[in-house]
Amino acid sequence: MKKLEDLKTKIDFTKIISKNKTFRVKFVKQGDVSLSSQEVEPYLGEVIFNQFKGKIKASMDNPDYIVYVYLFNSNCYIGIDYSGFDLSKRDYRVFANPRSYHANINYILLKIAELKETDTLLDLFCLSGETGIEAALYLTKRSPNYFGKKNFAFNKFFKFNFDKVDKEIKKTKSKIVLSSPTMGDVKCAQKNAKIASVEKSIDFTRQDIEWIDFKFKKKESVD
């Protein structure tokens, strides 16, 4: 996409957005892009309005649907925002250590490591506990947004059976150990894990590295 007229999309929004609902357009860009949100948002808004032949309203403050336009160089992506907030954020990070990796980075690393049930996970420098907490959430099938279900944007336009998903939450057979030579880090990790409701799935210990072997049985391996 190089010019504004290219936004005359073939997408039929009448099949995506329900009648008698409100909407707004948000524009995000990266790379070599000359277009601005002041140009793109009203333009696509008018395209959508015309598709509905005026039988839809725009709302800048509290729309039912947010139509996202993401432009990266000449590539344009258009979609509906189902979350309504940044999914990389974690509400449990109340006692955060500035040296910790962001929680979503920890989750990605756990996926790359192919963490699975019955594995043992040890974090020697747990800081504020994100690695172990993300592992516990993943293995117990508990959503990081378990307590924020009502905040999802899709609640405005369709009903989702959260109870069915919550029934999949289980105990994990894995051993997750969060350790640190500093008691302050251990306490922060414990508090964050409690906020995330996974503190019972994690062992917390203040240990110097040279003594950590005593935390595990002789035949027990650490993954």
PLM feature spans:
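Short, surface-exposed recognition loops or helix-turn segments adjacent to catalytic cores
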Residues: G54-Y68, L124-F125
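Short conserved loop adjoining the S-adenosyl-L-methionine
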Residues: W211-K218
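SAM-dependent Rossmann-like transferase core, predominantly class I methyltransferases
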Residues: I78-I112
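Non-catalytic nucleic-acid substrate-recognition regions in nucleic-acid-modifying enzymes
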Residues: M1-M60
